[in-house]
């Protein structure tokens, strides 16, 4: 008897166990062997199978199984599995005393017996287990992540008499000791083991018992696969993880080192010198290489600079380019541009343009195409080139020495006073590369935004508004709007470095050139630093790339020439969503009617669902453009006169890696009550962290502008979030909607719904709800703090913010009538 192992390394172990399930000796045949017989013509019953010896084999799916049942009694045996006799055919091949099964599957697992025909004697039995060891720790196992009981693993196997201390059953799966992964990835540690009795497994982190109680998102201990699974790892998960496998005959251990790399909030980095200038022979093939390093998902375009009507640049100074190749980093050979059978027309400048949600980077190279004879001379004449280099270098050194001599001679002369004339300010030379590029690789990429270099204007210029910062930017004809067609109105909000002004724009709607439309204008004040100016320009550039959507604040135009920078955006007459909801709360019992105040319209349950649905649509659009908001809250959603929800401030630059989230000072505030745990504790911002904030925003909507976590101090909030506490269901919210909020607040980011899924769910709910108005008796005051969140004197008990060091905010407003992106 034996087993022939396939070349793919069948792992097996063998145990012997006596079986005494039949009563022998009750009849006169007590001297006969206690071997179990299986009468011919009767199917084997698994519960009745008896053997003196069992062999257990572990196979991977796809292996070939080959069992031998050697016997001196006969040259032919019958094979049984479960309650079925095996027949020759298909994957099964029977030859004398040999059973062969090709390409085993999970269904082939079970008990196999070889039986002597006629007598029914069971000669041998085999237990076959088909297990996919390569996927033993993956999420798509058949148990779907179900956890086993650790106690079950330590029980003695029935009828076992062969004992053994724990040992590694698959050491080849444990070669990798160091795991260095970016934040947000899933990590699996495996320690596949065996022993008799079956050993138990424990996990230690840095030498201490580890059960994941204090980890955001918890862990999964998959005992049947001897694995530890951690989803959405963060920097605080770094450390040494040790598996301790033990039974009463011994113990073994193995350690893994986990290093979680923080995501880098930088635009793509291009390797210096690539692409490189290339000289090619006519008709040959050319390759340009562009090595891109980016933590955020990058998108890459290859551009060729072309001429239109004999000019390389348009009237606005932007070069004409042709997009040759567009792809993201996962595409095949995206960093290589192939040019086949090049001609003289292919000669020119080529640019590799790479971008992510943070910004853009580009590098260019020239292709020179030569006839075969010229290319041969170029290749054969290095000595001539070296001679030219020596001549030019010598000449340059001679000129440099002459210049030094002249300077030294002038220094010997007595100084003379000269009258200094006021310097004339000239525009800086620039290279405004056309951005035929979008944050999403599938977009049309028609934006012609320029890569700009900023310079301040002379102080002799007179700004249209006093105290407003001025500068020089290249003209972008697609977005430029004439200043003389703007009539500035009253300020809508003002902060330390910026202000928002209401204005009337004549002709900004090209279909109605003489009609005035109310808009909002963002301006940087004169005392703003270069960083505030740069932030506003970055916001403007990003809004150009984002395109237009009904549920976001859209860019309408810019004024960049002959004066301060104006960023013209849509105007929302009803202010931010938080104040919009609070103004429409039902009156309290002690309410006194005010004849001078016009009552606001009453909101129905359908209206509130519509608010959430519209915000989800806007966020789904931003997600499709790979834009992470990072500060989604009701205060950053604006409401138009037609009750259309518009997300604001998605273009603001936020340096999340430079913030101490635990330090409180008197200056600067952070919206901790809207932040996902991974963003709050580990500074990891993703679309999933925006989904968490959307859940809090939905809670705000159904409490009509309530303050999240009412009555809970910020310091206590940190502890409650780590322990898994969540806000209760609002009074006017259905169970289905509350469960949707709870899904948004799942501790594991990967388990939260996407904005696309949220849109689909809310669309379905919106289609089924009736216009039922809210119960006027519900006490909405329970969701309001004793003092307003926006006042600096409010205690930390109900403040929605925690403080950070003094980092100026571009648009930090006081009270406003209507705010746009502030």
Swiss-Prot record:
Residues 410-822 are cytoplasmic. Residues 486-774 form the Protein kinase domain. The modification Phosphotyrosine is found at residues 661-662, 773. SMART domains: IG (SM00409), IGc2 (SM00408), TyrKc (SM00219). It comes from the Eukaryota. Residues 39-129, 157-259, 268-368 form the Ig-like C2-type domain. Residues 1-35 form the signal peptide. Glycans are attached at residues 13, 72, 125, 240, 277, 309, 330, 341. Present in an inactive conformation in the absence of bound ligand. Ligand binding leads to dimerization and activation by autophosphorylation on tyrosine residues. CDD domains: IgI_2_FGFR. Residues 136-166 are annotated as: Disordered. It is a single-pass type I membrane protein. The active site is at 631 (proton acceptor). GO terms for molecular function: ATP binding; fibroblast growth factor binding; fibroblast growth factor receptor activity. InterPro entries: FGF_rcpt_fam, Ig-like_dom, Ig-like_dom_sf, Ig-like_fold, Ig_I-set, Ig_sub, Ig_sub2, Kinase-like_dom_sf. It is an enzyme of class 2 (transferase). One of its GO terms (biological process) is positive regulation of cell population proliferation. It is found in: Cell membrane; Endosome; Endoplasmic reticulum. The chain crosses the membrane at residues 389-409. Ubiquitinated. Subject to proteasomal degradation when not fully glycosylated. ATP binds at residues 492-500, 522. Its main location: membrane. Tyrosine-protein kinase that acts as a cell-surface receptor for fibroblast growth factors and plays a role in the regulation of cell proliferation, differentiation and migration, and in regulation of lipid metabolism, bile acid biosynthesis, glucose uptake, vitamin D metabolism and phosphate homeostasis. Required for normal down-regulation of the expression of CYP7A1, the rate-limiting enzyme in bile acid synthesis, in response to FGF19. Phosphorylates PLCG1 and FRS2. Ligand binding leads to the activation of several signaling cascades. This is Fibroblast growth factor receptor 4. The gene is FGFR4.
């Amino acid at each position: 008897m034996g087993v022939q192992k396939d070349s793919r390394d069948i792992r097996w172990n063998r145990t012997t166990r006596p079986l005494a399930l039949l009563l022998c000796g009750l009849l006169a045949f007590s001297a006969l062997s206690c071997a179990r017989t299986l009468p011919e013509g009767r199917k084997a019953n698994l519960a009745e199978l008896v053997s003196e010896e069992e062999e257990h084999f572990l196979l991977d799916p796809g292996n070939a199984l080959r069992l031998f049942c050697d016997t001196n009694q006969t040259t032919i045996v019958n094979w049984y599995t479960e309650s079925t006799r095996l027949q020759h055919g298909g994957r099964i091949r029977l030859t004398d005393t040999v059973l062969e099964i090709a390409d085993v599957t999970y269904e082939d697992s079970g008990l196999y017996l070889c039986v002597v025909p006629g007598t029914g004697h069971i000669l041998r039995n085999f237990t076959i287990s088909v297990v996919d060891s390569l996927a033993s720790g993956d999420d798509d196992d058949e148990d779907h992540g179900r956890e086993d009981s650790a106690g079950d693993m330590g029980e003695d196997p029935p009828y076992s008499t062969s004992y053994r201390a724990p040992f590694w059953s698959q050491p080849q799966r444990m070669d990798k000791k160091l795991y260095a992964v970016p934040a947000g990835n899933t990590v699996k540690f495996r320690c596949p083991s065996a022993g008799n009795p079956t050993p138990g497994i424990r996990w230690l982190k840095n030498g201490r018992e580890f059960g994941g109680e204090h980890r955001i998102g918890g862990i999964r201990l998959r005992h049947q696969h001897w694995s530890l699974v951690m989803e959405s790892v963060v920097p605080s998960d770094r450390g040494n993880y040790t598996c301790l496998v033990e039974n009463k005959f011994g113990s073994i251990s193995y350690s893994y080192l986990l290093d979680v790399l923080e995501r880098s909030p930088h635009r793509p980095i291009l390797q210096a010198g690539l692409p490189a200038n290339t000289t090619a022979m006519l008709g040959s093939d050319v390759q340009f290489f562009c090595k891109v390093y980016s933590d955020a998902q990058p998108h890459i375009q290859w551009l060729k600079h072309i001429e239109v009507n004999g000019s390389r640049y348009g009237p606005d100074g932007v070069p004409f380019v042709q997009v040759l190749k567009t792809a993201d980093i996962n595409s095949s050979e995206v960093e290589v541009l192939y040019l086949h059978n090049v001609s003289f027309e292919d000669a020119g400048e080529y640019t590799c343009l790479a971008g992510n949600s943070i910004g853009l980077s580009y590098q260019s190279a020239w292709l020179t195409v030569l006839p075969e004879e010229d290319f041969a001379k170029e290749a054969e004449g290095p000595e001539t080139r070296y001679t030219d280099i020596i001549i030019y270098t010598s000449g340059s050194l001679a000129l440099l020495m002459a210049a030094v001599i002249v300077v030294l001679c002038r220094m010997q002369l007595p100084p003379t006073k000269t009258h200094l004339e006021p310097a004339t300010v000239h525009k800086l030379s620039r290279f405004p590369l056309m951005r035929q590029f979008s944050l999403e690789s599938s977009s049309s990429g028609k934006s012609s935004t320029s890569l700009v270099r900023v310079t301040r204007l002379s102080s002799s210029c007179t700004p249209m508004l006093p105290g407003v910062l001025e500068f020089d930017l290249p003209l972008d004809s697609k977005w430029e709007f004439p200043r003389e067609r703007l009539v500035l109105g009253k300020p809508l909000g003002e902060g330390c470095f910026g202000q928002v002004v209401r204005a009337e724009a004549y002709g900004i709607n090209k279909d109605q050139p003489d009609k005035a439309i109310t808009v909002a204008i963002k301006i940087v004040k004169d005392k703003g630093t270069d960083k505030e100016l740069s932030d506003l320009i970055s916001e403007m550039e990003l809004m150009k790339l984002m395109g237009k959507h009904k549920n976001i604040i859209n860019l309408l135009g810019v004024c960049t020439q002959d004066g301060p920078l104006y960023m013209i955006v849509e105007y929302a007459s009803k202010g931010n969503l938080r104040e919009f909801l609070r103004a429409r709360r039902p009156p309290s019992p002690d309410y006194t009617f005010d004849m001078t105040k016009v009552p606001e319209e009453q909101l129905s349950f359908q209206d509130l669902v519509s608010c959430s649905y519209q915000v989800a649509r806007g966020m789904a659009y931003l997600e499709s453009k790979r834009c992470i908001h990072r500060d989604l809250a009701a205060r950053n959603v604006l409401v138009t006169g037609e009750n259309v929800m518009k997300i604001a401030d998605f273009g603001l630059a936020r340096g999340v890696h430079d913030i101490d989230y635990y330090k409180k000072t008197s200056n600067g505030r952070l919206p901790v009550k809207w932040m996902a745990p991974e963003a709050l504790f580990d500074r990891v911002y993703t679309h999933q962290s925006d989904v968490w904030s959307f859940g809090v925003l939905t809670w705000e909507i159904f409490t009509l502008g309530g303050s999240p976590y009412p009555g809970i101090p910020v310091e206590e909030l940190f502890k409650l979030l780590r322990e898994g506490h969540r806000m209760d269901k609002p009074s006017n919210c259905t169970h289905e909607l509350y469960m949707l909020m709870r899904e948004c607040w799942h501790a594991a980011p990967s388990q939260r719904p996407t904005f696309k899924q949220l849109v689909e769910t809310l669309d379905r709910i919106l289609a089924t709800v009736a216009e039922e108005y809210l119960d006027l008796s519900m006490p909405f005051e329970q969701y309001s703090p004793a003092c307003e969140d926006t006042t600096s004197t409010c205690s930390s008990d109900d403040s929605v913010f925690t403080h950070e060091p003094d980092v100026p905010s571009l648009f930090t407003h006081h009270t406003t009538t209507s705010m746009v992106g502030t």
